[in-house]
Curated annotation (Swiss-Prot):
ATP binds at G308, G309, T310, G311, S312, G313, K314, T315. GO terms for molecular function: ATP binding; ATP hydrolysis activity. Keywords: ATP-binding, Autocatalytic cleavage, Membrane, Nucleotide-binding, Protein splicing, Transmembrane, Transmembrane helix. PROSITE patterns: INTEIN_C_TER (PS50818), INTEIN_N_TER (PS50817). It comes from Methanocaldococcus jannaschii (strain ATCC 43067 / DSM 2661 / JAL-1 / JCM 10045 / NBRC 100440) (Methanococcus jannaschii). The chain crosses the membrane at residues 6-26. It comes from the Archaea. This is Uncharacterized protein MJ0781. This protein undergoes a protein self splicing that involves a post-translational excision of the intervening region (intein) followed by peptide ligation. It is found in: Membrane. CDD domains: Hint, VirB11-like_ATPase. It is a single-pass membrane protein.
Amino acid sequence: MIIKNQLIFVNFYVILIIWWFVMGILDKIQKKSEKIEKEKKSETVIPSDTKLKPIEPHPTINKKATVGNDETILDTYSIKIDEIEMEVVIKREEGYIYYLVPEIDKINMSLSKLTKDHLNHIKSQISDLGLIEYDQIREYLTNFSMRYNLAIPYIDSLAKFFYLVIGRLGLLEVPLNDDRLEEVMVNGYNVPVFVFHRKHQMCETNIVLDRNEVDRIIESIANLVNRPIDSRVPMLDAFLPDGSRVNATTADITMNGATLTIRKFSKNPLTVIDLINFGTLDIDTAAFLWQAVEGYFGAKPANTLIAGGTGSGKTTLLNVLSLFSMYNERIITIEDTPELQIPHKHVIKMVTRPARPGMPEYEVTMDDLIKNALRMRPDRIFVGEVRGKEAHSLLVAMNTGHDGALAYDEPIYLSDGNIINIGEFVDKFFKKYKNSIKKEDNGFGWIDIGNENIYIKSFNKLSLIIEDKRILRVWRKKYSGKLIKITTKNRREITLTHDHPVYISKTGEVLEINAEMVKVGDYIYIPKNNTINLDEVIKVETVDYNGHIYDLTVEDNHTYIAGKNEGFAVSNCSGTLHANSADEAILRLTSPPMNVPKIMLTALNFIINQQRIRRAGKTIRRILGIVEIVKGGGEGHEFAKTTLYEYNGLKDSLERRGICMWEEEVCEIAGITKEELLRDRENRKKVLSYLYKNNIRKLENVSDYIMRYQVDPEKLLRSIR
């Protein structure tokens, strides 16, 4: 009886254990099922047939890179994206050029073996397990395929796909990491991505993104740059951390779906040697521009404007020319997109800032930056692109070059023999034209008085003689603070602001410096009859001042004679512009919204016209002409144009045309003959030829040779013979 009861108890205990074990398993299964269901609900589905959808109009582009009768392989190379590499094939077929990623075929075949549930589970697990390395993802996929008995044909390719999709921008990472590309363009949903290749130009890719993927990428970029983009703010314009510029739109304003355009920031910018290789310009023209931009060792740098249409390579040329600046100059760059890469030591890079919705004060325009840059004592200003009123500020900078002014009681010497205090002279016009006063951000007000035809004694820095020049503007602003007072051995005196330029002699050259840099013992230029002479500075002091300070704008020379006891000679930046010719550039500058007075264009030395043209079935970039702006063009004309270089389409080359007045001016200032200037240009051609023949084209290397020439030309020439 006891035994029977024990057996019954034992049986009951065994049944209880079995029941507990079974219920535990069922509970685990239920929890696992709930977890999977939760993952399915929270995870974004990535359908394999949308991200890599074949391109219907040209189905051959999704094939592997094989050459048929009607197709030609133009290029093949690999793109490294952190831990992985992706092959790229450039193919021409029936007049189209395609940028193909052959790995997409393998990825398609592998994804076709997976269901949406598989995809969701894989993504969830990779994220939850923190698998960020390619080898980790590959190992996980290998185990996954074995566990579920899946015949995945290309595990390596599938691992690359998930490596790019999770935490990155998907297959768009391939063109974004290709340094040979200038631009990546997503034109909407379920359409091919296009790219602009430096060598092969516009190409259609076999990368097609669906709505979810395009929106995800744009949202990721917006979060990265901390900028909104939605139905209320349907456009985004910002910079990626690497300097690339991104523009995005939502489907609210673009009919084919959201768009994305990324202008890539080049890690290896083109140099003058690259442009010579491309045929954009030749060695002779390059040597001329080197000499002009540098100004023959800084004697007279040329103010230069680059004009051209969209995609003509204006900014690339500007970056190339910027390398020719003297190695020790203070350079300020002003751009919408930070593209200029100048390897000099003393460079300040400034970028505009667009307004935000409801925050117009957040905007910083190019005009704002130019005006601010002028207060930063730059030797050079490079402006990325001129579109509006900043053109006026830029030309004012070229014409005046400073914010300095004189004290009220400083005499000025008019051409009719009258000597009058500058304050009295200027105040008269401020009273006469009180309704025509224009204001600048630096506090100055000014009035145009060119129609008054009042002439003043002016110092010609080239001929070193005194000339009669017309006063174009009068300037005035309120000031309280310290002024500089300079006294010479012959008792000449002048009191002016610290930043007003005067002229001293140094090693036989005319040197323009600010008043605060004048030292006792310097020899300063003074007028004597109708020529110029030197007087020794015996005293430089600061004095307190409270009242208005004054200045003039004088045509041509931009100098005038001012100061007590017969006075002193006192004084009064490159950019790109959308235009298809020098004439169109001038028309745009002098028309709304730029409205630059024609008289101010004489501050420009050269206009370079660069365009994108079609030749032998290819799009190429060429300098089509270099025009010089010279003062005076006959009666009723403020300036004249001389074509120095002109493109010959038959020969595909630039040919020298007219006589260059800048060459005459720089010879006068530098104290050299025309033969010496041309001999120096030949030497520069030797340097460029050496770099070209030896394929020395990297930015840092080309810049080093230019700097070495500027420091010691003969030493460099000996080293390359």
